[in-house]
From Swiss-Prot:
Changing residue 36 to A: Grows slightly slower than wild-type, 90% dimeric PSII assembled. SUPFAM superfamilies: Photosystem II reaction center protein L, PsbL (SSF161017). This is Photosystem II reaction center protein L. It comes from Synechocystis sp. (strain ATCC 27184 / PCC 6803 / Kazusa). It is found in: Cellular thylakoid membrane. Changing residue 20 to A: Grows slightly slower than wild-type, increased sensitivity to high light with incomplete recovery (increased susceptibility to photodamage), 80% dimeric PSII assembled. Disruption phenotype: Very poor to no photoautotrophic growth, no O(2) evolution. No assembly of PSII monomers or dimers; the CP43-less monomeric intermediate is assembled. The lineage of its organism: Bacteria, Bacillati, Cyanobacteriota, Cyanophyceae, Synechococcales. PSII is composed of 1 copy each of membrane proteins PsbA, PsbB, PsbC, PsbD, PsbE, PsbF, PsbH, PsbI, PsbJ, PsbK, PsbL, PsbM, PsbT, PsbX, PsbY, PsbZ, Psb30/Ycf12, peripheral proteins PsbO, CyanoQ (PsbQ), PsbU, PsbV and a large number of cofactors. It forms dimeric complexes.
Amino acid sequence: MDRNSNPNRQPVELNRTSLYLGLLLVAVLGILFSSYFFN
């Protein structure tokens, strides 16, 4: 039971972290592109 609980918990945390990182990356890319377009 402990073995099953651990792998189940890790992917959820990883998915959340990757999701937040992805959003941050998209925001940074958007700002960079917008600055390029404005210039």
